[in-house]
């Protein structure tokens, strides 16, 4: 009776949800004998005999499968016997609808869909789909790819597709077009990158990564979302070798337009996840930083609500049940990373997943994967407000105790702060002995194992190891600004995040960065307490190498701060093109400045003006309505207006790039910017991006866009200027 009510209620909800048009709804309609829709979802059908299912499933899941499996078997049988393209298409659509609606079932959707996916594999459906993916008819390949994307659960990835289907998928990826096929193939690659490290590396080596990076320049939202998730999965599951190949193929740069999107928050978050994972690899961290994509992570996360993000995931069929334990486990190392961006995006995703798991009463999974302690560590030690707030929210949703934040200036702690810290790390039984010995922050940071055993009564060697593990973490996250004048802590952290633990021992001996190269290894051991010989060697080697290179903290201005190109754009219509231009120009060796909304309040205008003045070239993105706000702006308050006027007054090489823009009459613009209409514009082509970029580069390399001969090039990109007449 309860199951009947559940299914009836779900049918009623879907009726009201489908009574108004929604994107993609029409693809779920299955033609019936009269050409109309089918008889309705399988869970509302009655009169079917029971079918045996796995004995371990719950009663509700078993009931749903008993209704669905006969209908699925019938649809698969009809698909196998289909003779023509129309019949094959109808069969694929019917199976697709059954699986799609299973994923959308509330609470038990993952289990029911898993059962259907297993049945398709056992009935030979995977082999059939792999054959249909090689069919000559494009529509058949599109529908088969769409269905395969829906059923690539772990067992199906492992059983057949990874063993015999990678070649078929890679051949489809080489087609690149049309977008309907690319969308599903990107989704398939998204799933297959999760299969194993070996499979991931095979896909990277055989062209799968190249296809995903190529599609990053497209504009289809669903395709771009698959690309972002595919790159995130490749980074998380492919190991360091795959991460190196991703950076070599400039994946960090191609993630920029995805993370810079103004229309799709899910897309931006998945792209930020991908670049944050890449940045945790110390071998490629610097290259990832230079891409500029990493700077987008924290501002984006700070602007979003994980609860709303969780609702978006629940509303999508492929994420409605939240991530599985294996996927969640991959997020935990982000929390333990030394990179703030990785901690921030990891805390956001786990907070959103905590919302979903809280609704579905599956909180235990967070304890199983070890996320609770990592979240508590962030609350205690993170100095980033966004990260700490997200970790607190996740812990509350999971019903866990939220620890108090640790004051970062540990050296200044009084005895009371030491007592609080002992209680938080689970060493309350030693509070009395620490109190009797009057241990404050200074003594805590210089505590030795002998003192811990003899003076503080910690007899067990294992207990002392646990204590020093917590103390090392405290030393690593501590702020030494009050005693570390040469910023030794950050320099040590740049060698290895673990080396920050040695900061207080070094500065307590009166050492700074200018003296470190004069110290012997024995002095580091005996005076500074650095017990590990390998660490001593690495620190001394780096200190002596530092003599031959400028200090990172010196006041000299790095050349990377002087851009070759400044890109000006209108946010509401030109963001996507501006970000694409940035990537293309970076790949051709140009340094590019583009505002990423991370400038401090009050310094926004100064930073922009300085960047324009220092850049040789000024690329003006003229998207739809780009100059509308400039009209009647006689006080020059509009940012695009200010940027154009500054570029004109500084004599910059101005290169307008046109995309859906209509030139206004000169008299409608303020007089101080009318001269911009005399420059030759380059018409942007999404279909022929490389050709367009080549022309832009010719203008940037010394051929002024004011040169009238430039506009005479007979190419599809050229757009004549509209000067005053």
Curated annotation (Swiss-Prot):
Any single Pfam family the record assigns to this protein: TIR_2
Keyword set, alphabetical order: Cell projection, Cytoplasm, Differentiation, Hydrolase, Immunity, Innate immunity, Mitochondrion, NAD, Neurogenesis, Phosphoprotein, Repeat, Synapse, Transit peptide
Per UniProt, the transit peptide runs over: 1-27
Q: How is its activity regulated?
A: Autoinhibited: in the inactive state, the enzymatic TIR domain is held apart by the autoinhibiting ARM repeats. NAD(+)-binding to ARM repeats maintains an inactive state by promoting interaction between ARM repeats and the TIR domain, thereby facilitating inhibition of the enzymatic TIR domain. Following activation, possibly by nicotinamide mononucleotide (NMN), auto-inhibitory interactions are released, allowing self-association of the TIR domains and subsequent activation of the NAD(+) hydrolase (NADase) activity. Self-association of TIR domains is facilitated by the octamer of SAM domains.
Catalytic residues at: 643
Q: What's one GO BP annotation on this UniProt entry?
A: cell differentiation
Q: Report the principal subcellular site.
A: cytoplasm
- Single GO cellular component term: dendrite
Q: Which residues carry this modification: Phosphoserine?
A: 549, 559
Entry function: NAD(+) hydrolase, which plays a key role in axonal degeneration following injury by regulating NAD(+) metabolism. Acts as a negative regulator of MYD88- and TRIF-dependent toll-like receptor signaling pathway by promoting Wallerian degeneration, an injury-induced form of programmed subcellular death which involves degeneration of an axon distal to the injury site.
State what protein this is by name. NAD(+) hydrolase SARM1
